[in-house]
Amino acid sequence: MSRLSLLGLTAAVVLLSSFCQDRIHVDAAAACKGCAPPCVCPGTKGERGNPGFGGEPGHPGAPGQDGPEGAPGAPGMFGAEGDFGDMGSKGARGDRGLPGSPGHPGLQGLDGLPGLKGEEGIPGCNGTDGFPGMPGLAGPPGQSGQNGNPGRPGLSGPPGEGGVNSQGRKGVKGESGRSGVPGLPGNSGYPGLKGAKGDPGPYGLPGFPGVSGLKGRMGVRTSGVKGEKGLPGPPGPPGQPGSYPWASKPIEMEVLQGPVGPAGVKGEKGRDGPVGPPGMLGLDGPPGYPGLKGQKGDLGDAGQRGKRGKDGVPGNYGEKGSQGEQGLGGTPGYPGTKGGAGEPGYPGRPGFEGDCGPEGPLGEGTGEAGPHGAQGFDGVQGGKGLPGHDGLPGPVGPRGPVGAPGAPGQPGIDGMPGYTEKGDRGEDGYPGFAGEPGLPGEPGDCGYPGEDGLPGYDIQGPPGLDGQSGRDGFPGIPGDIGDPGYSGEKGFPGTGVNKVGPPGMTGLPGEPGMPGRIGVDGYPGPPGNNGERGEDCGYCPDGVPGNAGDPGFPGMNGYPGPPGPNGDHGDCGMPGAPGKPGSAGSDGLSGSPGLPGIPGYPGMKGEAGEIVGPMENPAGIPGLKGDHGLPGLPGRPGSDGLPGYPGGPGQNGFPGLQGEPGLAGIDGKRGRQGSLGIPGLQGPPGDSFPGQPGTPGYKGERGADGLPGLPGAQGPRGIPAPLRIVNQVAGQPGVDGMPGLPGDRGADGLPGLPGPVGPDGYPGTPGERGMDGLPGFPGLHGEPGMRGQQGEVGFNGIDGDCGEPGLDGYPGAPGAPGAPGETGFGFPGQVGYPGPNGDAGAAGLPGPDGYPGRDGLPGTPGYPGEAGMNGQDGAPGQPGSRGESGLVGIDGKKGRDGTPGTRGQDGGPGYSGEAGAPGQNGMDGYPGAPGDQGYPGSPGQDGYPGPSGIPGEDGLVGFPGLRGEHGDNGLPGLEGECGEEGSRGLDGVPGYPGEHGTDGLPGLPGADGQPGFVGEAGEPGTPGYRGQPGEPGNLAYPGQPGDVGYPGPDGPPGLPGQDGLPGLNGERGDNGDSYPGNPGLSGQPGDAGYDGLDGVPGPPGYPGITGMPGLKGESGLPGLPGRQGNDGIPGQPGLEGECGEDGFPGSPGQPGYPGQQGREGEKGYPGIPGENGLPGLRGQDGQPGLKGENGLDGQPGYPGSAGQLGTPGDVGYPGAPGENGDNGNQGRDGQPGLRGESGQPGQPGLPGRDGQPGPVGPPGDDGYPGAPGQDIYGPPGQAGQDGYPGLDGLPGAPGLNGEPGSPGQYGMPGLPGGPGESGLPGYPGERGLPGLDGKRGHDGLPGAPGVPGVEGVPGLEGDCGEDGYPGAPGAPGSNGYPGERGLPGVPGQQGRSGDNGYPGAPGQPGIKGPRGDDGFPGRDGLDGLPGRPGREGLPGPMAMAVRNPPGQPGENGYPGEKGYPGLPGDNGLSGPPGKAGYPGAPGTDGYPGPPGLSGMPGHGGDQGFQGAAGRTGNPGLPGTPGYPGSPGGWAPSRGFTFAKHSQTTAVPQCPPGASQLWEGYSLLYVQGNGRASGQDLGQPGSCLSKFNTMPFMFCNMNSVCHVSSRNDYSFWLSTDEPMTPMMNPVTGTAIRPYISRCAVCEVPTQIIAVHSQDTSVPQCPQGWSGMWTGYSFVMHTAAGAEGTGQSLQSPGSCLEEFRAVPFIECHGRGTCNYYATNHGFWLSIVDQDKQFRKPMSQTLKAGGLKDRVSRCQVCLKNR
């Protein structure tokens, strides 16, 4: 060991000497000037010594502070696939969510188009003035208003009388008076007579925005700002299956179409595997079977015009053609000459209803009560009503059972065992405020189960005798108007009479219109006359200074000032608030068991106990407080205590050896901002080099859509398109247009979600140098850095103290040998103060090196020397070891936003943090702005109660006292302990009800009692006043963010912040380790509390004996309605009813009065918690209450917002004939017909009788085109004589509309048939151009009430009230029922016009008004279908035919717009002949002229458009009967497909004669994104060949599709399989028994469903045969009140089996179940004699449901 030490010492000497050799003299002198002689050690460098042995390890250091949270580790490897977990138990019902935040106000709608000018209305008659309204109640004195505008000067009044103290003289003209308070709104006047016809007004301003349109398509899903917590929804469907170990979030799969694999055996649904790699392209398959014959192709393009064919034999006269379509409108003709006076016109249409006249006189008379209306549908749930006034206290209920023992308190600190003498009883202190609730105590030992109680007796008395009949009540108020009934069947057309009826009664006043736009300010009125002279004023002293004004609104924030100079270093601040508790340390070592306690003294003998048992003794007087007992005997040794707290940090150990440089650590999270450090010295300005610009980051995710911009102005009307209509086939979508001009900048949108974190950009330009921060903790020693550049020689620093010799350094490079110096010696003297700088002496000769002297004592540091000259560059040294970390700089200014980074991976769920320490109470806030004038306040609270007197002895039960006045509120009593159950006292006589007392002070929170019995319903409380609506706040736009200022000093503690929005639910953390604690020692019983205040009076006595009923008096005259009486005496309690169903949770009740202090009971053992009882039976319905008297008339309400569009009204009477419509467009060219063979001209036969119309023949196939004819120009032939017109054939019956069939195969060309008889009218032509917009129709009925509006913007904050006593924490109440409507409040002063609020809830639908006048005729609608042929007309007159040469058809001009008709002008002078005008409109047919000469045939013109139908020709001679045609065969079957559903798990069989196409599962409808899309159960689309709970996916605009990752639904026809016993959802293969099977069948003819609306199966129509019978299924709804329906003509509306809900609901997570929101709708039976009567409501129970369901049959048309 000594050798080793010597070796180490030698190495140290060698190293030290070598170290000293490398130092230059100048450095040595500079480093330790004044410490010791310079170290001069000549000699050669020794060899490197062996490394020394490591020293002993130092003491372990104190535990450091908690380090910053480490960065998340790299994601681990995927774990092995876990097994399916067991199905979890049903979760507890979630808490009621917070109400959602109000949505953003919608944008203002576009202005409507200006309406057309209305026709002049009939002038109304003047109405009579209404009666003056009743004088209103006197309002409270209002606040002084602002000075009004100067009024008009009044007329000069007579001179006033002289004042008291003056002879009086004319005063100066007084200032204008202030504007008076606006009067109350008067009652609406009666409607006035219609005024005279007014001049046509100018075009009106654009109308108000129209009614909101239907909901548009769903917009892009953007993440909006998180709303407030919503109300709890209905119980949700079961949760999703557990996540796999590696599934940190749902994987959004992009759907790629993979190759179809071979069909395997259908197994259970597997788990979703990861997407596999794309497969290889498969080989070409074998050629398929030849496909079915394709559908008939579209018509080809028209071929070239063929040559003219030979003239055929004249055919038979055709049938009279139908009227052709109207031609295009001609160009306007020249104005005609003024016509003569016309004949009197028909009576004009009634004009629009005139404005309402003034109110007529009140009519008298009492109508009889109308019939009771049908029960209306449930209204939309209203918003939460204002809280009503507290009701009168109900009768005291029976005493509840003893409550459960309260939670044990927190154990106190163990005190030293003391011994005190009992002192005198102190005076009662004031009751203290309620303290903060203590932390929950440790659980006590389990008690023993108590003994069973005595069984109770259920006694039910006999029912009472029937009372005598009451007097007849007053006639009831007419009931509400019932909902509009269903539309009846269309009645028979009435017979109109061409008369104008007498004018109708003046209609009721209409609903107030929408508020008009704010008008333009009017011109100032003329100055008024001088006012009357004011009275002289006597001695007018100065006014008393007014009260201090309300504090003003806080001003706007000023602009940030320039940064101020650096402040001085502040004083040390007050110690900060205690920090949040640190994270839990690791478990400490188990503490040693405690020492046994000191043995207690034996206790005194207790007093005799109370007799326990069913004795009827009254409770005794409580005894005096006993003395403290002596300490008890020592208890048993306690069990091991809880683990001790971790020990404090130990003292710092000695520093250990420097370790190896560690690996580079993971970047820690950004630390908290450090406090401001001491400002450092001003550093030199750093160099700045501009960095290279960074590469642009990745594009962030799409932000939230901004609010839509304001609508742009309406563009000018476009040029009308040319009216050349080629085949009306929709063209291909056009090319996208050029981007529009940029709109104005919209308001800032809501902030988008943060984009993914982008990659690090290139370094930016260095910012300005920040201030130095506080010194940071020393960092770890880093690895040696790269060799730095050679720095300039700095100034000499202040001489420091000589340090201890450092560790041995590495040997340096050998320095240049110095000149030998003189040998010096001497004893080191004490260090003197440094002297002044002497003059520079001449340089001495260098002396030889001296021996090294011993180190001198460290001297005191000298003053800093002056700056020396720059030395020469030294030789580069070895790279030094890495220095310690520098001080942390002060945070620089906020840098510019970096490019958004890519989104990081979701972190794992964090550990649950411990509850934080409760925050300190915030300071009182500044007083808010003064509120508006409120309604008169309710009476203030009474003062504090006086001290309670000494309780007197119980007196005898007195007679009922007179009605007491308001009692004072008592102070809250201390919480007494539970006393024993007292005996039931005698019932007192019920007292008169007292007036409504004011609310008492809140009491201390009582212990939770056992739930009491359901008390009888109390009488309704008086309705509360309605609060004034607050003014909405202005919508402010966010300002630009200011520059980050310097950090300011810590401000005073801020006001307590409002509760933040609830955070998102965190993911469930892992189960923590739990160690059961050992039970603590039993504490000593506490002292008895102070006596409580007097309790409330005892329960009411038994009800008195009912008196004998009086004789029935005669009915008196009905009196005037009295004012609302006081609340009556509570009635006698009825017989105890059976338990009712659970009601909704009531609102939290007022705290009860404190009870009398009971005697201290013995501490019982805690009982075992009982099991949940069974729900009670439903109680009997109570008797309906008496109808209340009518309330006072309320003030007129604010105009309601426009309701939604109502349902379409009843079919109106047929309108007057409309004006002739514009001419329609020309029809398209027809296809050329087949060429017939030449027939022989027949002899004219006798006219035959009209034959019956024959059956419609099948359409012939297209023939081949004929050979082109040659053009032959022959001489014109002689004009033949005109033949007689033929008779018209009878019209054929209209054919039924057939369903479109599949295209048939091409047939062979048929034989040319003989001329067939007239066919039925053809199919309607293609749809024409859309007609002009019709005129505005009548307003529809008011719509159903809309969805409740969003909550309004909160009003301004009122003045702060005085601090109240701390209330007891109430239980969270559920939403109460809306209170009854309160009495009308006193009319308030007219407030300022508020900003437009959010749209309120739609009002109730108004009473249906009388039928309005006929509106203007609408614009021409679309051309209707051709009507049935009219009756045969008489043969027309014989016309002379004239053949004019056909002219060239002109091009169609653009139809001009219809101008207003001008007034006829006077005849002007004849002008010179003008140019040839445009061809005029065709005039009326002139008399036939003489036959002209036959002209040369003209060239064949192009085929013209189809001309208008010609006039009816003369009847021709009857032709010869043609040969009978051969009977046609059956047309080929087009095939009709339908689906048939079995409603079982068996695949249904197609009916006889039908062939099955495929089989599958019965899909009813799907619901995605909250919208339902249904299937017709009679169509093949409702039979999917494969089943899945989520058979569809949704795709977005980013070409990404998602499968089973949303809350969507699918609904399937179900079987009769019942629900599971636990009613939990089914999953996997357990779903199969619930899903109905189906088959798709094909039949050759049409198939329909007929419904009887009766319990009997209907018969198929003649020519149809039945296929199956069933029940008429109409509609279905489910989640979100969404659903679809069945067409009643479809076979899907006739289900073979009836079930109330014939379908099951399935979700995307693979579960199916029946839910309470699923409803089925079935046609009900309608009796023949009750078709137009009010339907009787009826509720059917199970077993009799089919008695009211309509039956149906599916029928097939016979061939």
From Swiss-Prot:
Disruption phenotype: At 20 degrees Celsius, there is reduced axon regeneration following injury in D-type motor neurons in temperature-sensitive mutant embryos. GO terms for cellular component: basement membrane; collagen trimer; extracellular space. Residues 104-116, 140-153, 278-293, 399-411, 574-595, 833-848, 1037-1047, 1219-1232, 1247-1271, 1281-1309, 1341-1357, 1423-1437, 1472-1482 have a biased composition (Low complexity). It is found in: Secreted, Extracellular space, Extracellular matrix, Basement membrane. Transmembrane segments: none annotated. Belongs to the type IV collagen family. Trimers of two alpha 1(IV) and one alpha 2(IV) chain. Type IV collagen forms a mesh-like network linked through intermolecular interactions between 7S domains and between NC1 domains. This is Collagen alpha-1(IV) chain. It comes from Caenorhabditis elegans.
